[in-house]
């Protein structure tokens, strides 16, 4: 892997970390659960800061968050903090406001600690040739079922060809993401990730194949799986 290859300009990273993660059934927001000697959030931040093209990570935390500033990573001069909102889009937008004159911004889930350096490098290398950006994604491998509306019964099988699991990081031109995110919010569109905001405005971001072990810790059983994957990364 060659971090010096290419001419991609510096990238500012934004991590929306204002959520509470109720599905984890934990006593604290999921991003503050510990794997090894670090929180999930710290693992996610370190995965980005290891790349030389990412000089700064902006973390959007909840207004009542008392935990982030207690973490060692909070003292890193490359890490900035802002207050996020109730929705992911609000937190991302708050982070974008601090990105200054950066041309490109990368958004990564705070609860996605298992990012491989090779995936990040591939995303940067491929997306630098795009005018609209792109996302890490993994092709769907399982059989997909559509449920009947409001019921736990199968309606039909969904053809999995051309279906992808959206992952993060997601990388876009800063000005374009701000424009599309604001328009989607103003229109009341559902914004589940940053790519969906660009889709709302008629753009077609790139799909960059990434590893399926880049999981988002969402449920209690994900914690042990993430710990295993991180062990493999360390080795």
Swiss-Prot record:
Pathway: Isoprenoid biosynthesis; isopentenyl diphosphate biosynthesis via DXP pathway; isopentenyl diphosphate from 1-deoxy-D-xylulose 5-phosphate: step 2/6. The gene is ispD. One of its GO terms (molecular function) is 2-C-methyl-D-erythritol 4-phosphate cytidylyltransferase activity. Keywords: Isoprene biosynthesis, Nucleotidyltransferase, Transferase. The keyword Transferase applies. It comes from the Bacteria. NCBIfam families: ispD (TIGR00453). Its EC number is 2.7.7.60. The keyword Transferase applies. InterPro entries: IspD (IPR001228), IspD/TarI (IPR034683), IspD/TarI_cytidylyltransf_bact (IPR050088), ISPD_synthase_CS (IPR018294), Nucleotide-diphossugar_trans (IPR029044). It is an enzyme of class 2 (transferase). Homodimer. GO terms for biological process: isopentenyl diphosphate biosynthetic process, methylerythritol 4-phosphate pathway. The record marks 23, 30 as: Transition state stabilizer. Catalyzes the formation of 4-diphosphocytidyl-2-C-methyl-D-erythritol from CTP and 2-C-methyl-D-erythritol 4-phosphate (MEP). The record marks 160, 216 as: Positions MEP for the nucleophilic attack. This is 2-C-methyl-D-erythritol 4-phosphate cytidylyltransferase. CDD domains: CDP-ME_synthetase. It catalyses: 2-C-methyl-D-erythritol 4-phosphate + CTP + H(+) = 4-CDP-2-C-methyl-D-erythritol + diphosphate. It comes from Serratia proteamaculans (strain 568). Pfam families: IspD.
């Amino acid at each position: 892997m060659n971090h010096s290859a290419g001419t991609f300009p510096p990238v500012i990273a934004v991590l929306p970390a204002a959520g509470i993660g109720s599905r984890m059934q934990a006593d604290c927001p999921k991003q503050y659960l510990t794997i090894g000697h670090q929180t999930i959030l710290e693992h996610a931040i370190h995965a980005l800061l290891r790349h030389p093209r990412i000089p700064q990570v902006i973390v959007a935390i909840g207004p009542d968050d008392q935990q982030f500033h207690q973490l060692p990573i909070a003292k890193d001069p490359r890490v900035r903090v802002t207050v996020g909102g109730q929705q992911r889009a609000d937190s991302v937008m708050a982070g974008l406001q601090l990105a200054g004159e950066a041309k490109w911004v990368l958004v990564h889930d705070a609860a996605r600690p298992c990012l491989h350096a090779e995936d990040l490098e591939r995303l940067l290398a491929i997306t630098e040739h795009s005018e609209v950006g792109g996302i890490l994604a993994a092709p769907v491998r399982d059989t997909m079922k559509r449920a009947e509306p409001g019921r736990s019964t199968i309606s039909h099988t969904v053809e999995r060809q051309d279906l992808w699991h959206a992952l993060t990081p997601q990388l876009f031109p800063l000005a374009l993401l701000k424009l599309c995110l604001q328009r989607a919010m103003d229109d009341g569109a559902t914004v589940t990730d940053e790519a969906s905001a660009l889709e709302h405005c008629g753009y077609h971001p790139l799909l960059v194949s990434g590893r399926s072990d880049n999981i988002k810790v969402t449920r209690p059983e994900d914690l042990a799986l993430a710990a295993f994957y991180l062990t493999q990364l360390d080795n």
